[in-house]
């Protein structure tokens, strides 16, 4: 995680950008990246708090790359001021495994529309679980 600290969003720069552009949301770096991590990242929650204090109240803070981040760290980031969490890689990976297992389980005899429906329901359930885990208690 130390290797990416130089890329962390600076609160003063975020404030200037948000005020100049009047953006609705701002994706910031405080320890996450897109994709699958080799080792779990450690989030700089204090940086999120500093960013939340610096940027306008109507500009939402976005966390990219939440797959692989411990759920309690994501919850801490939400409590500190993140309003949007992008989480996809692990969900896609789990759904791909589900589809492969379903094809193997049926010896390849499952019809495409049945496979698609099963994959959709699996991913929907996974997404609901993630949403519940990331729910803000405020």
Q: Predicted segment positions?
A:
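Alpha/beta enzyme core
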Residues: 1-57, 71-80, 93, 97-100, ...
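Hydrophobic faces of well-ordered beta-strands that scaffold small-molecule active sites
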Residues: 26-28, 61-65, 83-87
């Amino acid at each position: 995680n130390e290797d990416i600290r130089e890329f962390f969003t600076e609160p003063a720069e975020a404030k200037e950008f948000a005020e100049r552009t009047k953006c609705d949301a701002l994706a910031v770096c405080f320890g996450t990246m897109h994709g699958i991590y080799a080792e779990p990242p450690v989030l700089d929650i204090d940086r999120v708090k500093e960013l939340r204090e610096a940027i306008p109240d109507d500009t939402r803070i976005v966390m990219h790359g939440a797959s692989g981040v411990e759920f309690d760290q994501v919850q801490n980031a939400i409590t500190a001021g993140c309003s949007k969490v992008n989480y996809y890689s692990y969900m896609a990976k789990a759904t791909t495994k589900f589809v492969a297992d379903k094809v193997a389980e049926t010896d390849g005899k499952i019809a495409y529309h049945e496979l698609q429906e099963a994959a959709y329901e699996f991913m929907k359930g996974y997404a609901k679980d993630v949403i519940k885990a990331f729910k803000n208690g405020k």
